[in-house]
Amino acid sequence: MNLVPTVIEQSSRGERAYDIYSRLLKDRIIMLSGPIEDDMANAIIAQLLFLDAQDSTKDISLYINSPGGVVSSGLAIYDTMNFIQSDVQTITLGMAASMASVLASSGTKGKRFALPHAQVMIHQPSGGAQGQQTEIEIAAREILKTRELINKILAENSGQPIERLNQDTERDNYLSAQEAVDYGLIDHIMTNSSEQKK
């Protein structure tokens, strides 16, 4: 059961109740938590577009705690992060694994944060295929293209050579917050919200 807390605010016109995510959105904060799939991606994209249209000179903070998920859904979020004019701060808490690690590393350079005990996990995309031989071959080629694309994005984001990414994503590769900074996927470890750049 997914319970969403409600926040009540007082104003001169009385009380107003918000679900917690709507209240955070007022402060330009978006929560990306849980598996990345189409419905979640659509909600994240809509929030990014809304906040950018509202004021493209202010940063958007994207808090990430996700095991990853559907690559096409994640790439839709990635493309939107690059499409909008607002800087997107990424703040990793808990875990940014798989496609979520791509998003965490795709924030505006200098504004990619992780909390001290966050983890980042990079690996090659997974998938399955069944059916006729030609269908399996097509699916295998598609997974190889996807791996190449993801590793290219991670190489650009981290400054690491593509050869290192190919090697380091061969299997699940877990990085602590400090290791993610050293690797170039994250810029800073943030222990206090006052360290966040506005």
Curated annotation (Swiss-Prot):
Coiled coil: none annotated. It is an enzyme of class 3 (hydrolase). Keywords: Cytoplasm, Hydrolase, Protease, Serine protease. One of its GO terms (biological process) is protein quality control for misfolded or incompletely synthesized proteins. GO terms for cellular component: cytoplasm; endopeptidase Clp complex. Signal peptide: none annotated. Its EC number is 3.4.21.92. Its main location: cytoplasm. It is found in: Cytoplasm. PROSITE patterns: CLP_PROTEASE_HIS (PS00382), CLP_PROTEASE_SER (PS00381). It catalyses: Hydrolysis of proteins to small peptides in the presence of ATP and magnesium. alpha-casein is the usual test substrate. In the absence of ATP, only oligopeptides shorter than five residues are hydrolyzed (such as succinyl-Leu-Tyr-|-NHMec, and Leu-Tyr-Leu-|-Tyr-Trp, in which cleavage of the -Tyr-|-Leu- and -Tyr-|-Trp bonds also occurs). Fourteen ClpP subunits assemble into 2 heptameric rings which stack back to back to give a disk-like structure with a central cavity, resembling the structure of eukaryotic proteasomes. PANTHER family: ATP-DEPENDENT CLP PROTEASE PROTEOLYTIC SUBUNIT (PTHR10381:SF70). Cleaves peptides in various proteins in a process that requires ATP hydrolysis. Has a chymotrypsin-like activity. Plays a major role in the degradation of misfolded proteins. Belongs to the peptidase S14 family. NCBIfam families: clpP, PRK00277.1, PRK12553.1. This is ATP-dependent Clp protease proteolytic subunit.
